[in-house]
Amino acid sequence: MPNQHMLLLFNLLPVGSNISIWWNFGSMLLTCLALQTMTGFFLAIHYTANINLAFSSIVHITRDVPYGWMMQNLHAIGASMFFICIYIHIARGLYYGSFLNKNVWLSGTTLLIILMATAFFGYVLPWGQMSFWAATVITNLLTAVPYIGTELTNWLWGGFSINDPTLTRFFALHFILPFTIISMSSIHIMLLHTEGSSNPLGTNSDIDKIPFHPYHSHKDMLMFTIMITMLFIIMSFTPNIFNDPENFSKANPLVTPQHIKPEWYFLFAYGILRSIPNKLGGTVALVLSVTILLTMPFTHTSHMRSMTFRPLMQFMFWTLVATFITITWAATKPVEPPFTSIGQVTAILYFLFFTMNPLLGWLENKISMTNT
């Protein structure tokens, strides 16, 4: 009997009839999560969390384990797909005012923070040059915390430098956090289904709802197919497109790479971090670059939920998208002019979106009131 109720919940779940393709990314994220969990499990079977053997175990997986190359590439490219989907998912939430469903938005932002931590721990595991030095630079930011910073850093490292205990605990965290993500995702979906999804118009969908299956389930299946096809095309033809060439060399604490940078999906935050020439200031800006999303439900002043009929906010939104892309590009470049200036300007523009949001909402309300 409970199974029957579960099927009814899936089949007869009422969903607004006018939700567009941008609402498909939630289910695509679920697919990515399932894929990452499965491939990650098979990789963990053959991986060795030891600084002398970690790099060799990755080589062993790709060369000797049957289909190991496929698992390793799917896991690496799948992480990039995960972040592409989540950034589009967040952009849709910002554009269509999904953040007004406070509980869903706050649980989603928490999920993003946990996901970023998981991806960071995973990037360290191959113990390549960039893995080691990215871990050194990012964990070293904890020393910026007043009074307890040094103790915190040593506690995280398990010693006075990044060494074997660090790799062991990062592997343990990388293994356990996805289960936290799965639990949080369930809460996120349950909270969503108490109120239901928003729609492109930003209106109440109650007057025009259709069953999730077969209508939206088929639309989701199409996007799954496109995503999996893209994943396999990248894996087959350009499997190392998202990798850093430095990471094909084993970690060497005595040789510093010319330009230390994290994976591409953290470059926007890294760009904001290095745009401030102060360690504590940069660390605060880095944390704010993600946590500022938490302010969105509380700073919304417009009478309209969606940006569909708000041209001023649309302009700000697309400026944010362009800023995000530019800051990501600038963060791949060395710390020298003009890239430092570009980084600083784009960092200001990034935070400007969140500060202008309540002001433009208030202005649009004034304009609409004078026109009626």
Swiss-Prot record:
Superkingdom assignment: Eukaryota
Annotated positions binding heme b b566: 89, 188
Compartment list: Mitochondrion inner membrane
Cofactor info, note text: Binds 2 heme b groups non-covalently.
UniProt: a ubiquinone binding residues: 193
Keywords: Electron transport, Heme, Iron, Membrane, Metal-binding, Mitochondrion, Mitochondrion inner membrane, Respiratory chain, Transmembrane, Transmembrane helix, Transport, Ubiquinone
Topological category with respect to the lipid bilayer: Multi-pass membrane protein
Chain positions recorded as heme b b562 binding sites: 75, 174
Family per record: Belongs to the cytochrome b family.
Function text: Component of the ubiquinol-cytochrome c reductase complex (complex III or cytochrome b-c1 complex) that is part of the mitochondrial respiratory chain. The b-c1 complex mediates electron transfer from ubiquinol to cytochrome c. Contributes to the generation of a proton gradient across the mitochondrial membrane that is then used for ATP synthesis.
Miscellaneous comment: Heme 1 (or BL or b562) is low-potential and absorbs at about 562 nm, and heme 2 (or BH or b566) is high-potential and absorbs at about 566 nm.
Quaternary organization: The cytochrome bc1 complex contains 3 respiratory subunits (MT-CYB, CYC1 and UQCRFS1), 2 core proteins (UQCRC1 and UQCRC2) and probably 6 low-molecular weight proteins.
PANTHER family (alphabetical): CYTOCHROME B
Official protein name in the record: Cytochrome b
Organism of origin: Pantherophis vulpinus (Western fox snake)
